[in-house]
Design a protein with these regions (language model features):
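Extended, charged amphipathic alpha-helical segments
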Residues: 194-344, 386-389, 397
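Glycine-rich and small/hydrophobic secondary-structure elements
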Residues: 345-359
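Glycine- and charge-rich intrinsically disordered segments
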Residues: 1, 243, 445-480
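Extended amphipathic alpha-helical segments with heptad-repeat/coiled-coil character used for oligomerization
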Residues: 362, 375-411
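Extended, regular secondary-structure scaffolds
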Residues: 124-226
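Extended, helix-rich architectural segments
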Residues: 1-141, 466-480
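Long, highly charged low-complexity segments enriched in Glu/Asp and Lys/Arg with interspersed Ser/Thr
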Residues: 425-459
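Short, surface-exposed acidic
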Residues: 326-331, 378-386, 423-438
């Protein structure tokens, strides 16, 4: 009897799946060098390209770092603070969104996604089911160094995705497909499937958060552009030149004309070293046979202001490239700027932050729609109206925000107890909830007080009716 053992799809990839995995892996590897280069500039670990002209070979190992790329990226990312996610038409009925966000710590995790997107040009959010049926969906932020996707620009959706990782020093990967997520490990014979999750969602549970998109480049670009890297290299070379000049010319050179050889010898007639001659506090010379005294002079000392002026010029150029106020990069003037002038110089940075907020809102809405789809198996109509609540990137003063909100309330444009009014004042989502709770408690106490007053008045009126005839009779007797 011949028994045929059927091939288990769980243990192997199909030919199409294998080809797709290899294509995604090749795409990831082809872009990794560029991503790692941006990462080096952000961390200050880049190797500065030396021109080989003014730096001697002995000092080429000198490494100078200037953190302007990190300052520029961090200044923008620090203005991208998420407060909450909610439904546009029902902000008070957004409990399921709050549950998902709190379970995944998305307010904090979103900062990682935004930072990676600004550094690398993109980051990814992968959505999966929770460890337990009662647990909210799991949302993880993934680095573009380990993950990539194929994207359909027409549908504005991810077609497939791949994430690489390691399990006990063994290469592994997750292949994200519209109807399944496949976990594989690398073996000598190829990729071996260790888990296949047939979720049947109809789309891969992956969202790409892209930065600086263009119509012909939806993958996104980094804020650390080629211009930023070039200026950083130039500034580092200038700092390196200043270090070399300090080593060679920090101590001014001296010259002595007409001195005898004995002036450079010690008491025993041995020649003094160059350092002993240079560092001697007193130089004593004898007159020659003609009665002449040797001429002693000094060359002009090293002036570092030449280099500092060049660095200031690079700082202004870098501030223009990054859209930052020059004082963010250490460039200052003799006259300190006023508060209004500082806010004026930050206008471009604020506008860039507002654009990033609008750009990142769409992928975050897609992340929550995927989470709801995984949790409930269905997408309600209101899932299309999920919005991200951002903190004001302009960081205005509380006084100016309060003044603007007060004027709108006085003009009758906004009600005083509106949540929009509290949002304009600058209160966070949690603070607004506490204000509403305090108002409800105050209204409840006032309602109880009013009810008590009404009951007391009613009892007083009832007692007045009961005692009214007796009081009238007593008055008549007294009058008689």
């Amino acid at each position: 009897v011949t028994v045929t053992i059927p091939e288990l799809g769980l243990l192997s990839l199909t030919d199409d799946e294998t080809n797709l995995l290899n294509a995604l892996r090749a795409e990831l590897m082809s872009r990794r060098f560029d991503l790692e280069l941006r990462d080096c500039y952000y961390n200050g670990e880049q190797v500065v390209r030396d021109l080989g002209i003014s730096i001697p070979p002995q000092l080429r190992g000198l490494h100078t770092v200037i953190g302007w790329p990190q300052i520029g990226v961090d200044a923008l990312e620090q203005r991208l603070d998420v407060e909450a996610w909610r439904y546009k038409d029902a902000p008070d009925d957004s409990g399921e969104l709050e549950e998902i966000a709190e379970a995944n710590e998305l307010v904090a995790e979103s900062q990682l996604a935004h930072l990676d997107s600004l550094i690398y040009g993109r980051s990814y959010a992968a959505v999966g089911s929770g460890d337990d049926d009662d647990m909210p969906p799991l949302i993880s932020i993934e680095s573009p160094l380990d993950m990539t996707v194929f994207y359909d620009a027409r549908a504005r959706a991810v077609v497939s995705g791949l994430r690489l990782y390691t399990i006990e020093d063994q290469d592994a990967a997750v292949l994200y497909l519209p109807d399944s997520s496949i976990h594989v490990v690398a073996t000598n014979s190829g990729w071996e499937v260790i888990d296949r999750d047939d979720h049947n969602l109809g789309l891969p549970p992956v969202v790409r958060i892209s930065n600086r998109q263009r119509t012909a480049d939806r993958i996104g670009r980094s804020e650390i552009t080629n211009a930023v890297m070039s200026i950083t290299d130039a500034a580092c070379r200038t700092l390196m030149g200043m270090e070399v000049a300090r080593e060679f010319y920090g101590a001014p050179q001296r010259y002595i004309l007409g001195a005898a050889e004995s002036a450079f010898q010690d008491a025993e007639g041995n020649a003094k070293s160059a350092w002993e001659t240079y560092l001697g506090r007193v130089l004593a010379f004898e007159r020659d046979e003609d009665g002449e005294v040797p001429t002693v002079g000094q060359f002009a000392a090293y002036d570092p202001s030449v280099y500092t002026r060049i660095i200031d010029m690079y700082a202004r150029i870098m501030a223009t490239q990054l859209g930052l106020p020059p004082h963010y990069l250490g460039y200052t003037t003799d006259n300190p700027a006023s508060a209004d002038a500082i806010r004026s110089t930050e206008a471009q940075l604020v506008k860039r932050a507002e654009r990033k907020q609008a750009l990142f809102s769409t992928p975050w809405s897609q992340v929550f729609r995927l989470a709801i789809l995984i949790k409930t198996g269905d997408l309600p109509d209101r899932s299309r109206r999920i919005e991200t609540v951002w903190r004001n990137p302009a960081t205005p003063t509380v006084a100016s925000q309060t003044d603007a909100a007060t004027k709108l309330v006085q003009a009758g444009i906004l009600p005083a107890d509106s949540d929009v009014t509290l949002e304009m004042v600058g209160l966070t989502e949690g603070q607004r909830r506490r204000v509403h709770a305090d108002r409800r408690r105050a209204q409840g106490r006032q309602a109880l007080t009013d009810l008590g007053n009404e009951l007391a008045a009613a009892r007083q009126a009832a007692r007045g009716l009961d005692t009214g005839p007796e009081v009238a009779d007593d008055a008549a007797v007294e009058g008689g």
